[in-house]
């Protein structure tokens, strides 16, 4: 399993089967060997999100966005990571961009609106 594609394929198979922890292993190896592959980094970000490693997942989605700034899914996922970390004000921008890029995606609009509302009304301390 030395080939990046084989590691990516194995990781995505595990990811699709719901084995998120296991998927992160070959996907991280593939990322280390081919850090410029946005498909690998997006899949790794998804796996990390599912295992609640939101900061690391956000880093992967940022790397995708650096190379593909109009990747609506990566923008959406970055926004969701930021929301899960309680950073609703920071989540507004990527979620708004994702919703603009794909206006037919209701889920993008729902999470964009939630981030806006939470950022405007922070929890009481």
Give residue ranges: language-model regions:
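Register position in tetratricopeptide repeats
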Residues: 16-17, 50, 84, 117-121
